[in-house]
Amino acid sequence: MRKFETLLLLSPELGSQPREDLLAVLTGVIEREQGSVLAVDHWGMRDLAYPVRKHMRGYYVRLEYAVAGPSVAELERIIRITDGIYKFVTVKLADEAEEAA
């Protein structure tokens, strides 16, 4: 399994409960694909440099997880069709062996 990190920009109009429900769906997808969620960091409401869907603020969340590579495509598919997620970016984190070198 590889480690990945996904940064999500959520709608500022989502309340705390719908936001938690949305994150529960995403963590459920990771666990369904035999992965594990390592960290969920709520960065909170931040100002944006430019308008995104006519909003100048957005709520940021960082997900760190370990999952098989092909399973990331399924997670990104779910993210794309989910209302309330404006933007996202996924990166593969370096393995511990690569970090030590």
Curated annotation (Swiss-Prot):
GO CC annotations on file: cytoplasm; ribonucleoprotein complex; ribosome
Domain of life of the native organism: Bacteria
Keyword Ribosomal protein belongs to the record: yes
GO terms assigned for molecular function: small ribosomal subunit rRNA binding; structural constituent of ribosome
Keywords, ordered alphabetically: Ribonucleoprotein, Ribosomal protein, RNA-binding, rRNA-binding
The UniProt record lists the keyword Aminoacyl-tRNA synthetase: no
GO terms of biological process kind: translation
Entry-linked PANTHER family: MITOCHONDRIAL 28S RIBOSOMAL PROTEIN S6, SMALL RIBOSOMAL SUBUNIT PROTEIN BS6M
Described purpose of this protein according to its UniProt entry: Binds together with bS18 to 16S ribosomal RNA.
Record family assignment: Belongs to the bacterial ribosomal protein bS6 family.
Protein name: Small ribosomal subunit protein bS6
Protein source organism: Oleidesulfovibrio alaskensis (strain ATCC BAA-1058 / DSM 17464 / G20) (Desulfovibrio alaskensis)
